[in-house]
Amino acid sequence: MKSIAIIGGGVAGLEAATNLSRMGFSVTVIEEKDQPGGKLNQWHALFPNRRPAAEVLASLKNHAKLGINMMLNTRVENIEKNDDGFALALNHNRMITAHAVLLATGFELFDASKKEEYGYGIYDNVITSVDLEQAFEKGIIKTAEGKIPKKIGFIHCVGSRDEKAGNPHCSKVCCITGVKQAIELKERIPDSEIFMFYMDLRMFGRHFEELYKEAQVKHHIQFIRGRLSEAFENQDNTVMIKIEDTLLAKPLKMNLDLLVLLVGMQPSHGIDKILHDLEVEKDADGFLKQADSQLTPSKTNVPGVFAVGTVTGPKTIGETISDARAVTLEIANYLHNKVASKILKNESYFI
């Protein structure tokens, strides 16, 4: 039985593992955390239909139970390529072998504290979109002082489309995440005022535009085109922001009870050593380079090493699931062709 090692037990890794196992392969998922699910564990509800994240995660976990070796709290320390495939050295002096390797290590969230002018980690009432999502999960939406926020601002593209931050790419999901979160806030705090400060709004997915219109028409959420220049904390712990309204070409000051920073996706650096060992190439933006972004998007430059999900760039969960299902066919074809090649090389033995 051909074996496959999947590094990363998030959405992409779990879905790929399930499908590969159903195809009859021996699958090992290597996850460095104490539970699978990746960033989905941090989320409350998903756009655009606000389906509970826990529901999607439970489905992925249940399917992945079938015939899969799940190694939690496990880290790959070294990989070596050999004639049969790959030898993976793990922490605690463990070793496994595999005929193919699938990189599913996902992304990292931008560290908002690097944008000091925004005040995250400095001012108590400046939070990130992830912090807000976890507050939704707990059912407690309050300021640091325990008050219900009545005036809330969202800043788009924090750590995305920002060359100074080293991330010139668009994170793809921040705009719709902000809209979804703003609507949920408005439903929980009907008398609140909510302001969205953006560079450009990119509602590319199905039903995204409808959700954006709902935010404006039904919930009266205000969208202001402009970039935050600075945030200050007032004596009462409210946050004052300075923004330039780029449509009106006017500076703007506003006091807020809560400021939410929509943090973007950036490449994960947790497997840099592995990539170096295998000589897997990265793109200029730091995400893994696809062998052919149109025809073979899951292949890397190294035969037998595949990549799936947000390790190759920002994606929605739906796109990640589709990517994971597609890569299973790529891996199956690779292993089938490898077996066929060995048979052809040895055909003289049967003549």
What are these regions (language model features)?
Residues 1-351:
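Residues forming the flavin
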